[in-house]
Amino acid sequence: MRKTETMVQLSPSRTLETLTPSELTVEKDDGQGSPKPESPRMLSALQLALSSTTVYCGYEKYIEDGLICLKHKIRNIEKKKLKLERYSDKLKKGEKLNEDQLEAVGKYDEVVHNLKFAKELQKTIGSLTQDLLKAQRKAVRQEKQMKTDEEKSRLSLMLQVQYVLHSLQREDVRKNFCNTRQYSCYMSTQDMEGLMDLASLVGCKRDYSISLEDQMRRAAIVYWELLEGNEKPVAGSTYKHMKEKLLRLVDSGFFDNIPLPKSDSQEKTETIKPDSQSRPSGLTTLVKLSSNEVPSKEFLNRRYMPETDERRRGETASPRNWKEDFLAMKEREPPDSWEMEELADPPASSQSPIQKPWKGAAGLIPKTVDIVKRSTTDPKEKRQRKKAEQDSKSMPVAVEVFSSPSPLPKDPVQRRQQLETLMDQISGSFSFMQESLLDGESSPVNTQTKRCRPSPGSSTPIVQRELTKSPSDILPSSQRSTPLRILLSGEGKGCLSNGDRSINGSDLELHSEDKPRKQAEGFNSPPLYRRGSSISVSLENQSTVQAGRQMLCNGVSSSGSAQTFSTPPSRRSISAENPFHNIHSVFNVIGESSGMKADESGFSESIHRSFTSAKTSSVTTASTQTPPELNPPEEDLQIEGQYPLECAVSAGGPVFSSSHSRVGQSCYSRGAVRGGYDAYRVNVRSPGGSFMSQTHREPASALYMARENGYQQNFKRGAGTATQRSSAGWSDSSQVSSPDRDGAYPLDSGLSDTLSIPAMEVPMNPQGPHTLMPVHVYPLTQLRVAFSAARTANFAPGTLDQPIAFDLLHTNLGDMFDTGSGRFTCPATGAYVFIFHILKLAISVPLYINLMRNEEVMVSAYANDGAPDHETASNHAVLQLFQGDQVWLRLHRGAIYGSSWKYSTFSGFLLYQD
């Protein structure tokens, strides 16, 4: 009760409505760090400094301050009215009040009257202020418009004076002006000399003794004095007299139509005449050019159009220019799609097509590229056809033309071989002639003859593709899948029996080394586009290759191919000396035909293989196929999981066949492991040789089978059927652009969580292929960035736009926040979250806070209620930052309150990293 008496105690000489808010409120001690409003009467030195720096824009600012003061008065009177109403209610209920409270209740009607009067006064002053501000703004606009018009008129007058002075520099204009009776009265000879001197002062002529800037500055002073019309002397007269003379000349009308000088008119006529004469000559030359180049029509097969360079008529090409053109084309246009091109050989060598390497799954349908570029205009196209015809006549090029003499030899064997080669070239990626697999098993000699057709007429042919037939060759092109790497098997080696070949394991780069006999002929086949190192395989003859292949199938190395295969660093190294040195012999091959058949069948992307006995090997191929040129070698392939098509299904889970007695299944049963990456999905092979199905999942580690050579483990998402997962089963992705080539590999755990793991090297030990090797998977390290800073001292700069520094740091993960400058430096590109809360000092100046990214304002905060109270300005933002960006807070205007309770804070953290 004593406290209430203190709050409502009135001064005998003052009324309630005239009291200030500080006099009506008694503050109690809230603690050490609580903000306390100061009285406006007792201004500190800081507040006086801020008030002195505050700039008032105009009279409307004073009116706004008066309205704010009146608003606070009304609010205080309303509070007093509510207090008196409570006292009246207590008095009606019979409660006792002291003398001061009874006196205050007696003045209730006066307080209500004062409140009503104050509200009406506020409304009236507000409307008058709006009218006054509108009138003031209108007057300011009119004044500004008048100043603009005046400046425009002065500028126009200056340009007119400048034009008159420049025109008087011409002698013909001066003579014409003085000799004309109508204008001779405007100016005497003395006035003309004075104007000439004035023209030199205003810069009509360049004075090279001084700089251009100094000359124009002096001319500007002369123009200013001239437009003002002062009585200062200049050029034997005054500025006022000169201005009057110049205005008379401008108003005379003589300078409205001044004839051009004769020299300029003559130059214009001379420039027009050569243009009119040059036009008919250009037309005649164009007619001559078009008449000389009348092409003759000729049928050309664009699929096998030779690469020729467009040359001018009558120019002969050297015999080896086509090599330079071919190499330049390869460097300019790398092989990115399936294309067919043909290089033309001299008549001494036969045609041998060249095919660009098959690359990735860019498209499953092969396409051809027109080598002869077409133009948009008909005359140019005709000229190009004419040039192509002349080049074909000058160079011995093998072009397929109708009704041409047959180049086939008379020997029936060679004639048959060349016809089959021509059929393969015409068929392209489609196979119109199919062969039986049974014939190959029964007659290996015939099969080898069909597979390997040496190119007649040349011992070093240009290899376009392997002239081999496998089960993948028989299927149509519409069912081709993503091509794998080339098959280094005996069938391909037999076709390349002459000379040493270099085959790239990654991009199918085929070229032939020069032989001394071919160097004598003076013609070499150009190498195709090369991207990496090649795999050198020495092939002496067909029998050696067949014997070596049979020994490789039995696990015995061949001494004839003891060379090292060198590949790019990203590939795994392959040694042909003993590629199966750590693999147990699990099957035997009896007879040359069965070994050839198993080797010739190739490894297609969707192949399914099962070895049912130790004496026979059966091969089953699916509907899709891979071109035979890009089948990977057997040494590079490792069967990770089998997906047989026709197998029994057991009730307890999948059962896989081994060399003893194995039964597989073609579908998943309940509890079988599905999804996940390959090593997680495939079934585990026990050391005994049988397969076990995994019915549980353990994301902590995975089991991998040992490889026969160094291998970099890759992970893929497991999805789809067995045919779709066949590329993952063979673990060969050298020709396919996939996420496995990147640094991080997505790993699907099957539990709706995705981990990103780096590529790992699995150490290989000389042990059997059935050994299980645990490899632990760890996620990538997440970048930890977060900070939280506070300010414990007041901050009131005397100027605008000052950075805010923070003297207390709660958190600084990553050490990217600098307390001295208050700036956060972005360590990595990503999305960041920033939050700030700034408390305004209890003064009448509003608070403006800007969140800055480098020098750009991202978000802002404002705090002001029109009274000297504490207010908080806060905001937040989610920003996309790049590495090196700086984020900081800027105090645009106002002052910040700081205490040990840390009211002003600035925080931020990394949301996600790009």
Curated annotation (Swiss-Prot):
Record protein name field: Caprin-2
Any GO BP annotation: positive regulation of Wnt signaling pathway
PANTHER family in the record: CAPRIN-2 (PTHR22922:SF5), GPI-ANCHORED PROTEIN P137 (PTHR22922)
Amino acid composition bias (Low complexity), ranges on this chain: 610-626
One Pfam family named in its UniProt record: C1q
Domain C1q positions: 780-914
Keywords: Calcium, Cell membrane, Cytoplasm, Differentiation, Growth regulation, Membrane, Metal-binding, Protein synthesis inhibitor, RNA-binding
The species this protein was found in: Danio rerio (Zebrafish)
SUPFAM superfamilies noted in UniProt: TNF-like (SSF49842)
Organismal lineage: Eukaryota, Metazoa, Chordata, Craniata, Vertebrata
Sequence positions that bind Ca(2+) 1: 865
Described function: Promotes phosphorylation of the Wnt coreceptor LRP6, leading to increased activity of the canonical Wnt signaling pathway. Facilitates constitutive LRP6 phosphorylation by CDK14/CCNY during G2/M stage of the cell cycle, which may potentiate cells for Wnt signaling. May regulate the transport and translation of mRNAs, modulating for instance the expression of proteins involved in synaptic plasticity in neurons. Involved in regulation of growth as erythroblasts shift from a highly proliferative state towards their terminal phase of differentiation. May be involved in apoptosis.
Binding partners and assembly: Homotrimer; via C1q domain.
Gene Ontology terms: cellular component: cytoplasm; plasma membrane
Domain comment in the entry: The C1q domain is essential for the function in Wnt signaling.
Stored SMART domains: C1Q
Top-level taxon in the UniProt lineage: Eukaryota
